[in-house]
Design a protein with these regions (language model features):
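Catalytic donor nucleotide-activated moiety binding site of glycosyltransferases and closely related
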Residues: 1-38
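Acidic donor-binding loop of glycosyltransferase active sites
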Residues: 47-60
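Short acidic alpha-helix that forms the nucleotide-activated donor recognition element
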Residues: 39-48
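Hydrophobic/aromatic beta-strand patches that form the interior of the parallel beta-sheet core
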Residues: 3, 35, 51-53, 71-73, ...
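C-terminal alpha-helical cap of glycosyltransferases
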Residues: 143-161
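Short glycine/proline-enriched turns and hinge-like loops at secondary-structure junctions
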Residues: 46, 64-66, 158
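Hydrophobic, well-ordered secondary-structure elements that form the walls
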Residues: 2, 53, 63, 113, ...
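Catalytic binding pocket for nucleotide-activated donors in carbohydrate/polymer assembly enzymes
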Residues: 58-138
Length: 161
């Protein structure tokens, strides 16, 4: 099964109409679901999926946080403006934190992406260490006791007032 969850700008901006129609054409297949514009909560999609294939979307971090493999495509084709003036895209990207995208495979072309998809579906633990490292880096300790720590910290802060 394939779940397509496009960014909201595909629904909102006229210049992406062709891209949206391309995704809509996939829905003729019974195993393809295209999320609607008002389906903004991605959690149901995260839990229903075995693998995420994405661009540089923050949803990758959420998906990795639930312990599932992700593929971050690095073979993006930038708009003509950004190809002519690459500094404009570099200015928009936080290149200092590019290491975060290494939470999963980062294919440089379509053939690599297909190979990575097969590998991750066969072996979901392939990049498990990378996902756990990212989770610790962004979230901290993941032990189910965060609520207790928050309460303890609030009580501590309250007693200091």
């Amino acid at each position: 099964n394939i779940i397509l969850k496009p960014h909201s700008h595909l629904f909102l901006r006229k210049k992406y109409t062709k891209d949206l129609h391309r995704l809509e054409s996939w829905t003729k297949y019974p195993n393809v679901y295209l999320a609607k514009f008002n389906e903004t909560n991605i959690l149901p999609f995260l839990h229903a999926s075995d693998l995420m294939i994405s661009d540089m979307s923050s949803a990758v971090f959420e998906f990795s946080g639930v312990g599932k493999p992700a593929i971050i495509n690095m073979f993006l084709r930038y708009r003509l403006l950004h190809r002519i003036f690459p500094h404009k895209i570099t200015k928009r990207l936080d290149t200092a934190n590019f290491f975060l995208w290494e939470v999963g495979d980062t294919p440089r072309n379509y053939a690599e992406m297909l190979q990575n998809a097969k590998e991750n579906l066969t072996n979901p633990d392939k990049n498990k260490e990378k996902r756990e490292k990212l989770s610790r880096h962004i979230v901290g300790i993941v032990d189910g006791k965060v609520s207790e720590r928050i309460v303890d910290k609030l009580l501590e802060l309250n007693s200091n007032i």
